[in-house]
Amino acid sequence: IYKDKNYGWPISSDGNMYVDGYNDGDEYSLSQRNYKDHEDMGFENPIFSFIPSIGITEIVELEDEFIETWKNNFLVGSLNSKHLYRIKFDKEFKKINYYEKIFVGERIRDLKYDSRNSQVIMALEDSGSLGILKKKSIKINLF
């Protein structure tokens, strides 16, 4: 995601359109809103889309000291799928080289990387717990 780029929502979508009761007064008619080609509408094309939507909550970049094999990876929190997603881009950030679903079992409301302690902290919605993904164990602890 780049600053000042328009990815088209809610006019253009790779997934389902949710237009019931939606009226923002823009110049696009409802018939134009389900248009799949972002570029033809003047929007930036995403390099990857979660279809169906996973309900992205937070995206964090993992710094070098977390785990060598996860160096410069991103973690994506999800409300819909109850998974954490690990994503590795190519060097130019033009395509995804690797993507992994990590089962958490709860909706991830928020996600933060604690570089001082080399851990990822997740606010879990269903139980109100904190989930911690630690550098050494790579397992999720619920508190």
Regions found by a protein language model. Give the residues of each.
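Blade-level signature of beta-propeller repeat domains, shared across WD40, Kelch, NHL, RCC1
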Residues: 112-143
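Beta-propeller domain segments
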Residues: 1-97, 129, 135-138
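Conserved blade-ending motifs and adjacent loop-strand segments that build the rim/top face
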Residues: 94-115
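Small/polar loops that bind or transfer phosphate-bearing groups
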Residues: 76, 103, 122
